[in-house]
């Protein structure tokens, strides 16, 4: 399974995504761009299971997780065997 995780600029530093993640792929890092002075880090996508709990927990739609199963990806690219 491969994952593409998009991070947008609307993080408010609430830590909801970090607390929701069952595999701890996110962490908060210092950032001066919001009141909380922290932002969710880029996730370790190799450990992401694609459950989208972080996305569901986010109150500002900061995270977008797209999960592609290998056979679906190859089929959509015309590479299915």
From Swiss-Prot:
Binds 2 [4Fe-4S] clusters. Cluster 2 is most probably the spectroscopically characterized electron acceptor FA and cluster 1 is most probably FB. Keywords: 4Fe-4S, Chloroplast, Electron transport, Iron, Iron-sulfur, Membrane, Metal-binding, Oxidoreductase, Photosynthesis, Photosystem I, Plastid, Repeat, Thylakoid, Transport. It is a peripheral membrane protein. It is found in: Plastid, Chloroplast thylakoid membrane. Its main location: plastid. InterPro entries: 4Fe4S_Fe-S-bd, 4Fe4S_Fe_S_CS, PSI_iron-sulfur_center, PSI_PsaC. GO terms for biological process: photosynthesis; photosynthetic electron transport in photosystem I. PROSITE patterns: 4FE4S_FER_1, 4FE4S_FER_2. One of its GO terms (molecular function) is electron transfer activity. Signal peptide: none annotated. It comes from the Eukaryota. Its EC number is 1.97.1.12. SUPFAM superfamilies: 4Fe-4S ferredoxins (SSF54862). Its cofactor is [4Fe-4S] cluster. It catalyses: reduced [plastocyanin] + hnu + oxidized [2Fe-2S]-[ferredoxin] = oxidized [plastocyanin] + reduced [2Fe-2S]-[ferredoxin]. Residues 2-31, 39-68 form the 4Fe-4S ferredoxin-type domain. One of its GO terms (cellular component) is chloroplast thylakoid membrane. [4Fe-4S] cluster 2 binds at residues 21, 48, 51, 54. It holds the Pfam family Fer4_21. [4Fe-4S] cluster 1 binds at residues 11, 14, 17, 58. Apoprotein for the two 4Fe-4S centers FA and FB of photosystem I (PSI); essential for photochemical activity. FB is the terminal electron acceptor of PSI, donating electrons to ferredoxin. The C-terminus interacts with PsaA/B/D and helps assemble the protein into the PSI complex. Required for binding of PsaD and PsaE to PSI. PSI is a plastocyanin-ferredoxin oxidoreductase, converting photonic excitation into a charge separation, which transfers an electron from the donor P700 chlorophyll pair to the spectroscopically characterized acceptors A0, A1, FX, FA and FB in turn. NCBIfam families: PS_I_psaC. The eukaryotic PSI reaction center is composed of at least 11 subunits. PANTHER family: PHOTOSYSTEM I IRON-SULFUR CENTER, PHOTOSYSTEM I IRON-SULFUR CENTER-RELATED. This is Photosystem I iron-sulfur center. It comes from Spinacia oleracea. The gene is psaC.
